[in-house]
Amino acid sequence: MASNFLTKLFGSRNDRLLKQYRKTVARINAMEPEYEKLSDDALRAKTVEFQGRVARGESLDDLLPEAFAVGREASKRVMKMRHFDVQLLGGMALHHGKISEMRTGEGKTLTATLPVYLNALGGKGVHVVTVNDYLANRDARWMGRLYNFLGLTVGINLPQMPREEKQAAYAADITYGTNNEYGFDYLRDNMVYEARDRVQRALNFAIVDEVDSILIDEARTPLIISGQAEDHTAMYIAMNKVVPLLVRQEGEADPRTGEGVTKPGDFTIDEKSHQVFLTEQGHETAERVLAAQGLIPEGASLYDPSHITLMHHLYAALRANHLYHRDQHYVVQNGEIVIVDEFTGRLMSGRRWSEGLHQAVEAKEGVEIQAENQTLASITFQNYFRLYSKLSGMTGTADTEAYEFQEIYGLETVVIPPNRPSKRDDQLDRVYKTTREKYEAAIQDIRECHERGQPVLVGTTSIENSEIIDDLLNKAGLPHQVLNAKQHAREADIVAQAGRAGMITIATNMAGRGTDIVLGGNIEKEVAAIEDDESLDEATKQARIAALREQWAADNEKVKALGGLRIIATERHESRRIDNQLRGRSGRQGDPGSSRFYLSLDDSLMRIFAGERVRAIMERLKMPDGEAIEAGIVTRSIESAQRKVEARNFDIRKQLLEYDDVANDQRKVIYQQRNEILDAADLSGVIAGMRESCLTDIVRQYVPEESVEEQWDLAGLEKALADEWQIRLPLQQEVESAQAITDGEILEKVVAAGNAAFQAKVDMVGPENFHQFQRAVLLQSFDSNWRDHLSALDYLRQGIHLRGYAQKQPKQEYKREAFELFRQLIDQVKNEVTRILLTVQVQSPSELDQAAEALESRAEQIANVTYTAPTETGEPETLPDPRTAGAGGDGLNLPEGVRIGRNDPCPCGSGKKYKQCHGKLA
């Protein structure tokens, strides 16, 4: 009560904002006469003047009145459209990073041109986000004329585009595209192996059209890129045959004397750390056996750069055969390996070991080796759009979700008044007892409208409902057209004509969004066809266009006299916003119109939330069959039911976000590190830091910090350094010969020895040549471990709710365990990279180049890449890879199963390497 009184006294926050904006509108209007006098060239020159002022430090806020005035004047000349004052208000809200709620037909597309123009002056790029490719293409071409006139460049970002075209689209001042494509490009940019292959710039400013659809309806499902890593089935089988030929060593050798081995062998097992290590004899045996099998050339070393992956497979096979035992660590069930939880003894169906171990166990047991389908990258729309420095959006219906926009995105909603007050008559809902009665009443209403020539739009909540009404109208002999939100371009044409006299159009709620329904029909296509007809002279063109417009004006008046567009809906959507969108398609720009919802007690929303209450009212009133109840109390109880559903859906989205925020913080760290690696000219500092950290960890296992000599296990340390890192250091001798030595000095000696061993490899081929190899090793390790980490987070997320039964907070437990998993990921990358760089045997620069290429190519050879994105209802939908990973998705017609190496000559005959030619498109 008190808040209502204060609002009346001081005005709402919305009123105060609009009052502030109207002062600026007055300034813009005052400039109009001055700008009307400018020539086209002088008006265009204003852009260069503004860009100079921004470069010198003037803020965009200060430029706003002049830039908006220039944008409006240019629109009058190029588009033959003048921005209304309310469109200026909407544009200001967008520039200030708010959501602009403008009713359908108020010209949102034109409104956006002003803040887009203003923000593009900064040179950092503006992204306009639409719900489908058709609208992105249409708006970019339509509004692009205005931007080009003002000297700005426009790009369209579509799927299937080659990389160079995408880069050009993002480099433009203004880029149009869909939410899915922007998100997928961001993920793909964080999977590239060369900085020059990235397509996006820094994310500066985005205006999201139909912001409620994108940031709310589609926010329940994340964008996911998944695929199968390169198929190594043959390699796992081959390695499984090598393992029985290697013999386990019994007893541990003293690094100084070599004594202690009771039976020499090829590998040792460390039960404590669950690891297997090859002995020197084992390396020789393995090399001999692998050469005999044709897996490596005669006389080659396992530590050659080109054989790094062989070591990985050999160790996986050794661990599978000697550390993982059937019916203890796993069981074989229906031809699959199922992991056994070591703590509970339960079977963990669906989970797989990483690092190739699962495939190695499959090879050991002789079951089918499954190429693992992994999540390669994923992000939710909430987290993607929060990466922009400034975000804003526009829609016809945001006010019902204003709380969510503020809570999740920090976006305030500003309700912009219509240019002309609405004359639409929103009639009370009619509720029937049964579905049959509801449909009969709706068809009767449609028939009456059709007989008098009034156009009707029938809105449905699903394709299934559309088909029911389609069938009923066919039986009633009423001509109509059906739209089901699939062919966006055809949709727009049908929706544009839905306002013609006598038209009946059935549409699902989402179909044809972004296209206005003009009373009397839309004649712009016919006008454009006449203008493009080269066989007609100018006078004939003008005469025909004038006749068309005259006919349209008569049709328009006729439809207005009949009551405008009639909206008939046969079900309430679970969101009030979607119902309001449907209503908003009628009564645009002050046109007449009407809407009515026909409901039954059998409708799912009524049945679940409001049915009992309304049924009780009907029974109390003793309503006969076929009679409807039409009362404010019923409509209010339905809206209250919708509010309950909206609140539940908000909680689902909020919970998804709370869990994804954990992964998001980690994603930012990984992607930032990845980008730094890609851009760095010198990685020696990063590598040195990793090496020092690894060697410190290993030293501290055997020589604890601030410990005395009696607590040291120098023999164990020497062995670990030699086995795992190939650092041979006579620490025991040095300690015995030294007067006094501290644990810190031991650590210094080990780090110095590691640095020297590493530097010797760099000196052999030169820092330049070693840089590319280091970078490939780092990126490959980051990527493969990040993929495994995403799978681990998925598994953790699936079972975390069970912690609630143990009186623990699932979200807190998830955060804690996800952090621990992330710490393990960083340690794993550190150890993996350091081990490879310390143990690799370098012979020549060319060999190192080949190894780097092989690593990059292995990382990029991911088969069956699929893209999962939300549909317009928020349900997940799997899309094929628009680029088709590997050869064949690049315009080359290759026989099935043929793959081209990155360094092979391109089959197109250009003479270039495949990676520099058609491989770029793959």
From Swiss-Prot:
Q: Name one GO molecular function term.
A: metal ion binding
| Cofactor entry | Zn(2+)
Q: Which Pfam families match?
A: P-loop_SecA (PF21090), SEC-C (PF02810), SecA_DEAD (PF07517), SecA_PP_bind (PF01043), SecA_SW (PF07516)
Q: Which residues bind Zn(2+)?
A: C906, C908, C917, H918
Please tell me where this protein is predominantly located.
membrane
Q: Which Gene3D superfamilies match?
A: Helical scaffold and wing domains of SecA, P-loop containing nucleotide triphosphate hydrolases, SecA, preprotein cross-linking domain
Which InterPro entries does this entry report, sorted A to Z? Helicase_ATP-bd, Helicase_C-like, P-loop_NTPase, SEC_C_motif, SecA, SecA_CS, SecA_DEAD, SecA_motor_DEAD
Ranges for region Disordered:
867-912
Print the keywords alphabetically: ATP-binding, Cell inner membrane, Cell membrane, Cytoplasm, Membrane, Metal-binding, Nucleotide-binding, Protein transport, Translocase, Translocation, Transport, Zinc
User: EC annotation?
Assistant: 7.4.2.8
The record's free-text note on cofactor binding: May bind 1 zinc ion per subunit.
Q: Which SUPFAM superfamilies match?
A: Helical scaffold and wing domains of SecA, P-loop containing nucleoside triphosphate hydrolases, Pre-protein crosslinking domain of SecA
Topology relative to the membrane, per the entry?
A: Peripheral membrane protein
Compartment(s) where it occurs, according to its Swiss-Prot or TrEMBL record: Cell inner membrane; Cytoplasm
- Gene Ontology biological process terms from the UniProt entry: intracellular protein transmembrane transport; protein import; protein targeting; protein transport by the Sec complex
| GO cellular component, as recorded | cell envelope Sec protein transport complex; cytosol; plasma membrane
The protein's job, in short, is:
Part of the Sec protein translocase complex. Interacts with the SecYEG preprotein conducting channel. Has a central role in coupling the hydrolysis of ATP to the transfer of proteins into and across the cell membrane, serving both as a receptor for the preprotein-SecB complex and as an ATP-driven molecular motor driving the stepwise translocation of polypeptide chains across the membrane.
Subunit structure, as described in the record = Monomer and homodimer. Part of the essential Sec protein translocation apparatus which comprises SecA, SecYEG and auxiliary proteins SecDF-YajC and YidC.
The Swiss-Prot or TrEMBL record describes its family as follows: Belongs to the SecA family.
**What name has this protein been given in UniProt?**
Protein translocase subunit SecA
Q: Which organism is it from?
A: Paracidovorax citrulli (strain AAC00-1) (Acidovorax citrulli)
- Recite the lineage of the species: Bacteria, Pseudomonadati, Pseudomonadota, Betaproteobacteria, Burkholderiales
Gene name per UniProt: secA
